[in-house]
Amino acid sequence: VSDEKHLERIIKKLDELGIESIFVPGGDRPEPMGDFNNALDLLRALKKLGHNLNKIGMAAHPEGHPDVSNEVLMEALEEKKDLADFIVTQMCFDAKILNDWMVEIHKKGIELPVWVGLPGVIERGRLLKTSLRIGVGDSLRFLRKKSQVATELMKSSIYNPDDLLKDITEQNDINQTNLAGYHIYCFNQIETTEKWR
């Protein structure tokens, strides 16, 4: 989205198409392609311009981001909380880190529903390559330290999120958070993900 005029055209088109919900990711470009430096700028412009959207989602990174400090990420979430309706997290492999992050945002008054991003059924090699590319670093470091979990992940050529889901539901504090459900990253493996579901 290059500027407010472009955003106005997009809002108009969304309205014409009857689209009522959007997701605003942060983006990973080193330099902005237009007037908006980040998702917060875009969300502010959406509010200023007005729209007919019922739901606006924003991204979050429970395990951090390779180019942004955790402090800056948390500040951005706090600033965006009144401009969005739900959160979708980046893909995560560590139930404890996820639980602690969910508790932390709840304590900070960020009470939006959170859809936790999990990898779906996918070839292990493709999952690891994608994880490295998108910066799921803490999870990968976690896997290196926890040989049993890493062994479980590596024991077949296909990754399945069942054990991770079980670990998340067994976290002591998870029921005191705003966990709304799970967003499954299927990596275009729709058929295998649907069979798993």
Where are these regions (language model features)?
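Short, acidic/polar
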Residues: 4-12, 68-79, 161-171
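Catalytic beta/alpha-barrel core
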Residues: 20-26, 85-95, 183-185
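Active-site-adjacent beta->alpha loops and helix N-cap segments on the catalytic face
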Residues: 2-10, 28-49, 67-71, 91-109, ...
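Ligand/cofactor pocket segment of small-molecule handling proteins
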Residues: 52-85, 92-94
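Non-catalytic positions within long, well-ordered alpha-helices that form the structural scaffold/packing
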Residues: 15, 80-81, 106, 175
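Conserved, mostly hydrophobic/aromatic
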Residues: 14, 80-83, 116, 168, ...
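Active-site pocket-lining/capping segments in soluble small-molecule metabolic enzymes
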Residues: 26-27, 34-64, 108-173, 187-188
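Short, well-ordered coil/turn segments that N-cap beta-strands
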Residues: 18-20, 51-56, 84-85, 110-114, ...
